[in-house]
């Protein structure tokens, strides 16, 4: 998802201290993965059970929600901070800290929670599984998150193409209202909280939080300059927090089972469980919930049935959705699937959408296709993105044929660096990073293709 992010280097405001899950005296874990069924938060990920209210209640949703609400915002925020939960939409920003930005003295304006369900990142399909098969878990998360930040209502902005998901969500909202779980005096807690659904229109750019807010307000989905940040001036000019579907949906379970329980999974600063999408050249593509910091190789071999043709047939993996740089097989052997480990590997966790490519893949053509996507989805507001991504798209089309000179590889790298970090939102970064990953790890393939094209061109000239 096009997040509110700079994936490879987010920073915190000055004088803000963050407590991550690893700030304890407990012995550090050294192995990760093999999540037990009793520790899974999403128990209907594959839609094998009833997704309506009756089925959700039987699986533990809405259990003692009233007690959670009555404990108040400070307690909820404390548990979220203790858990070490970081944003699951790509940014990886500490959720407890982000939600606490809303807890300022009221100036009379209502506060809102906006849930980003505009899942448009190629390769990513985790949030739609929650919307389709566990909508009540999301609604309960909206209520708990809204209580934590004193929000009056939640707006769930759902991708326009998600027709069935939106339909299920609307049914779940109606059930929750009829049961008194949301609305006036939600769960009998004395807290009033409404939930509204807003349908998108198929624009990838609206996955960026301020473009999403613009779209909710009925305007063109174009990112806003920041500051002011949404926590000060968001939807309808009111304080707003924009959060990912998965981030919101796990919050009630964290409050019920305790932040310390959630922090017990994964490495320091990378705690909890996570939904991973595994697609591409694997035997059994799937969406699976696993422990953070699970080895990438184990994730593919255990849950997706392995790479087609065996592990030795692996060429490269895009580990976090199309906007994250690819990594070759040599890196995939040992890398862990969490924020910090993938940053060290010069890529990112992103949305944890693992795209596997075997040796049959034309890696240059694959990356060129991604650049074409970003060129198509650019809103055109920023010159580096509008002009730079269009230029990269044209150059990559020539690179696919080999119709270029080796010196142009360096020019492409330089242009990608000029786009990165010089745009209002992160779409420019998302277009630049796949190119950088390709050049970093597959430059010899580019040069060989150019050499082959030049030889064929010379042969044709000689023949004529």
Swiss-Prot record:
Cofactor note: Binds 1 FMN. Binds 1 [4Fe-4S] cluster.
GO MF, one annotated term: metal ion binding
Keyword terms of this UniProt record: 4Fe-4S, Acetylation, Disease variant, Electron transport, Flavoprotein, FMN, Iron, Iron-sulfur, Leigh syndrome, Membrane, Metal-binding, Methylation, Mitochondrion, Mitochondrion inner membrane, NAD, Oxidoreductase, Primary mitochondrial disease, Respiratory chain, Transit peptide, Translocase, Transport, Ubiquinone
Span of the transit peptide along the chain: 1-20
Domain of life of the organism encoding this protein: Eukaryota
Binding site for FMN: 199-247
Catalytic activity: a ubiquinone + NADH + 5 H(+)(in) = a ubiquinol + NAD(+) + 4 H(+)(out)
InterPro entries (UniProt xref): ComplexI_51kDa_subunit, NADH-UbQ_OxRdtase_51kDa_CS, NADH-UbQ_OxRdtase_suF, Nuo51_FMN-bd, Nuo51_FMN-bd_sf, Nuop51_4Fe4S-bd, Nuop51_4Fe4S-bd_sf, SLBB_dom
Membrane topology: Peripheral membrane protein
Signal peptide bounds: none
Keyword presence, Oxidoreductase: yes
List of residues that carry N6-succinyllysine: 81
EC number in record: 7.1.1.2
A single GO BP: mitochondrial electron transport, NADH to ubiquinone
Main location: mitochondrion
Keyword match ATP-binding: no
Binding site for [4Fe-4S] cluster: 379, 382, 385, 425
Modification type N6-acetyllysine: residues: 81, 104, 375
Pfam families tied to this protein: Complex1_51K, NADH_4Fe-4S, SLBB_2
Cofactor(s), names only, from the UniProt record: FMN; [4Fe-4S] cluster
Coiled coil: none
Role played: Core subunit of the mitochondrial membrane respiratory chain NADH dehydrogenase (Complex I) which catalyzes electron transfer from NADH through the respiratory chain, using ubiquinone as an electron acceptor. Part of the peripheral arm of the enzyme, where the electrons from NADH are accepted by flavin mononucleotide (FMN) and then passed along a chain of iron-sulfur clusters by electron tunnelling to the final acceptor ubiquinone. Contains FMN, which is the initial electron acceptor as well as one iron-sulfur cluster.
Subunit record text: Core subunit of respiratory chain NADH dehydrogenase (Complex I) which is composed of 45 different subunits. This is a component of the flavoprotein-sulfur (FP) fragment of the enzyme. Interacts with RAB5IF.
Disease: Mitochondrial complex I deficiency, nuclear type 4: A form of mitochondrial complex I deficiency, the most common biochemical signature of mitochondrial disorders, a group of highly heterogeneous conditions characterized by defective oxidative phosphorylation, which collectively affects 1 in 5-10000 live births. Clinical disorders have variable severity, ranging from lethal neonatal disease to adult-onset neurodegenerative disorders.
Family: Belongs to the complex I 51 kDa subunit family.
Record's protein name: NADH dehydrogenase [ubiquinone] flavoprotein 1, mitochondrial
Source species taxonomy: Eukaryota, Metazoa, Chordata, Craniata, Vertebrata
């Amino acid at each position: 998802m096009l997040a509110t992010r700079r994936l490879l280097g987010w920073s915190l405001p000055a004088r803000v201290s963050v407590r991550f899950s690893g700030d304890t005296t407990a012995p550090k874990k050294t192995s990760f993965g093999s999540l037990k069924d009793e520790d899974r938060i999403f128990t209907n990920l594959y839609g094998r059970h009833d997704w309506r209210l009756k089925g959700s209640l039987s699986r533990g949703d809405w259990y003692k929600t009233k007690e959670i609400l009555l404990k108040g915002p400070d307690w909820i925020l404390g548990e979220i901070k203790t858990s070490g939960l970081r944003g699951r939409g790509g940014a990886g920003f500490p959720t407890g800290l982000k939600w606490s930005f809303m807890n300022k003295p009221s100036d009379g304006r209502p506060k809102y929670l906006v849930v980003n369900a505009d899942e448009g990142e190629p390769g990513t399909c985790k949030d739609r599984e929650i919307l389709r098969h566990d909508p009540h878990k999301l609604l309960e998360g909206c209520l708990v998150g809204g209580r934590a930040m004193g929000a009056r209502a939640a707006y769930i902005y759902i991708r326009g193409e998600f027709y069935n998901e939106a339909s299920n969500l609307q049914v779940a909202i109606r059930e929750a209202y009829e049961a008194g779980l949301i609305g006036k005096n939600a769960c009998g807690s004395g807290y009033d909280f409404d939930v509204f659904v807003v349908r998108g229109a198929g624009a990838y750019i609206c996955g960026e939080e301020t473009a999403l807010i613009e779209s909710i307000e009925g305007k063109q989905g174009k990112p806003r300059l920041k500051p002011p940040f949404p926590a000060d001036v968001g939807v309808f000019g009111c304080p707003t927090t924009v959060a990912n579907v998965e981030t919101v949906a796990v919050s009630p379970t964290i409050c019920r089972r305790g932040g310390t329980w959630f922090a017990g999974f994964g490495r320091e600063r990378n705690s909890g469980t996570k939904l991973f999408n595994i697609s591409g050249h694997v035997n059994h593509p799937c969406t699976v919930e696993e422990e953070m910091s699970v080895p990438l190789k184990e994730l593919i071999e255990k849950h997706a049935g392995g790479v087609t043709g065996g592990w030795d047939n692996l060429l490269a993996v895009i580990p976090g959705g199309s906007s994250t740089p690819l990594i070759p097989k040599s890196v995939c052997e040992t890398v862990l699937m969490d924020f910090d480990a993938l940053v060290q590997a010069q890529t990112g966790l992103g949305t944890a959408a693992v795209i596997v490519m075997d040796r049959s893949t034309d890696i240059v053509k694959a990356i060129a296709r991604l650049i074409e996507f970003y060129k198509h989805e650019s809103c055109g507001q920023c010159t580096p993105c509008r002009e730079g991504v269009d230029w990269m798209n044209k150059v990559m089309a020539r690179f696919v044929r080999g119709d270029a000179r080796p010196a142009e590889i360096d020019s492409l790298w330089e242009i990608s660096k000029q786009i990165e970090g010089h745009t209002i939102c992160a779409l420019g970064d998302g277009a630049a990073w796949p190119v950088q990953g390709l050049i970093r790890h597959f430059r010899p393939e580019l040069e060989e293709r150019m050499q082959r094209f030049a030889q064929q061109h010379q042969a044709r000239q000689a023949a004529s």
